[in-house]
């Protein structure tokens, strides 16, 4: 029994210490640091808007994509909605999904005969990307302009206001935040 305790006591103590350090102390320190250094992002980047009745309400997060399907809105990437996002790019299932999404885009805007940008017909790995490429936003400018009765110049200006540059100036591609563009478009009515 003494030999058993000599073996198991350090293992149990080590397990408890590692659990405390990795499960409580480290996450606590990271949370405190994130809340202090990146308060808005650490709390979900919640966007609040003034409503017609004068109250302010939460409308969404700048970091989580929302589904927009009305033609007067900028529409983001396809949501995964229970569909696997890790499909083989050459699989029949992926091909059918993309064809279905292409047909949806053609039905939404039958006058647009340009090539549909890839990010509008494929889901992201997370399935909730808040951003689309500049090409995907540009593809939708004419439709939004027509549906809202505003100039394409106004739509392009709003898109430009909500376009983020490359990370550190060289990493990745510029992206357009879909929710922020749509909120700005809605504010034009006011």
Curated annotation (Swiss-Prot):
It holds the Pfam family KdpC. InterPro entries: KdpC (IPR003820). Keywords: ATP-binding, Cell membrane, Ion transport, Membrane, Nucleotide-binding, Potassium, Potassium transport, Transmembrane, Transmembrane helix, Transport. Its main location: membrane. The chain crosses the membrane at residues 13-33. GO terms for cellular component: plasma membrane. The keyword Transmembrane applies. The keyword Nucleotide-binding applies. It comes from the Bacteria. It is a single-pass membrane protein. It is found in: Cell membrane. GO terms for molecular function: ATP binding; P-type potassium transmembrane transporter activity. The system is composed of three essential subunits: KdpA, KdpB and KdpC. Part of the high-affinity ATP-driven potassium transport (or Kdp) system, which catalyzes the hydrolysis of ATP coupled with the electrogenic transport of potassium into the cytoplasm. This subunit acts as a catalytic chaperone that increases the ATP-binding affinity of the ATP-hydrolyzing subunit KdpB by the formation of a transient KdpB/KdpC/ATP ternary complex. NCBIfam families: kdpC. This is Potassium-transporting ATPase KdpC subunit. It comes from Listeria monocytogenes serotype 4b (strain CLIP80459).
